[in-house]
A protein has these predicted regions:
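Short, structured coil segments at secondary-structure junctions
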Residues: 21-23
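Anionic-ligand binding patches
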Residues: 2-5, 13, 19, 42-148
Length: 148
């Protein structure tokens, strides 16, 4: 049994949290030729919870494939994705400061949800037939004060 996990996330905060908990992590980041951003495209009519769970599952599948392609030693792989939802509207990463100000204006004085999906995958080993995975969803309600 390995004494570390792979973290398939570019979030410095996720790595910091795991290290604070005493977890030994190895980063398992996408190759330059991987189109990781395309995994985050919102499907028409997709609800926020379904979206964040689907994206996390796709990221986990890509990370497990990356692990296999690179010939790295098998160990659990952790992936996560977080999104903000205002009603059924999924707020993606703002592409400009103007878009960021508009999003903050939309959130001002209102309640929104922060949804985080987490998935852990165990790669297929010699003794098992295939990889296994587990997932969870956390939903937090946040109320913004009025921004002026």
């Amino acid at each position: 049994m390995p004494d570390f996990i792979y973290l398939a996330s570019q979030s410095p905060r996720r790595l910091q949290l795991l290290e604070q908990w005493g977890a030994r992590c190895e980063l398992l980041l996408p190759d330059d030729q991987e189109d990781a951003e395309s995994l985050e495209a919102v499907l028409p009519g997709e609800a926020p919870a379904a979206y964040v769970q689907r994206v996390t599952a796709l990221k986990l599948a890509a990370a497990l494939d990356r692990l296999r392609r690179r010939g790295l030693p098998p160990a659990p792989v952790l992936c996560a994705d977080t999104t903000v939802a205002l009603g059924r509207r999924i707020l993606g990463k703002p592409q400009s400061s103007t878009e960021a100000r508009a999003m903050l204006g939309d959130l001002s004085g209102r309640e929104h949800r922060v949804l985080t999906a987490v998935a852990v995958g165990q790669p297929a080993g010699r003794a098992s037939r295939g990889s296994r995975s587990w997932s969870a969803l956390s939903v937090s309600r946040v109320r913004f004060g009025v921004l002026t």
